[in-house]
Amino acid sequence: MVIDIARLDGNTQSFVFGTVARAIYDLKLDGDRNDIPDKIILFVDELNKYASSDAPKSSPILKQLLDIAERGRSLGIILFSVEQFRSAIHDRVKGNCATQAYGRTNAIEVSKPDYRYIPKVYQNMMTRLSPGEYIISNPALRSLVNVKFPRPAYKQFPNG
């Protein structure tokens, strides 16, 4: 199921997102039902809206996201999120992220402490990546990997 909240106003987006996240978490915690999938992917675009590094600790949505980031994997909940500025995300959410994909960003962003462990050559690459090109980081990989997704078939030919 996909729930697109892009056309809703900010408060309604927060309400819908928080309600859906809580419902998924509660369903997985209950665990008595056989009709619930083993894995549920919660995809969040612009994660800083809900798990900002400066969000108040009392934020119910932040608490839910921290629960999902910290305990969700053991329940079969996978948090997949996209954010242009990694430094804007809450530290505990970032700390529980295994795989990270870095797209093009600016020099100001890569100069922040979040990027200190990334070699300078990759930081420089991040400021010049093309659309569809990413740098992948995962603990299972010995070094960062540069990945380039091909253009869609309909865009590969000049007349087609």
What would you call each of these model-derived segments?
Residues 11-13, 144-147, 157:
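Short helix/loop capping segments that flank catalytic or ligand/cofactor-binding pockets
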Residues 60-62, 66-150:
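Conserved ATP-driven motor cores of ASCE-family P-loop NTPases powering translocation/secretion/packaging/pilus
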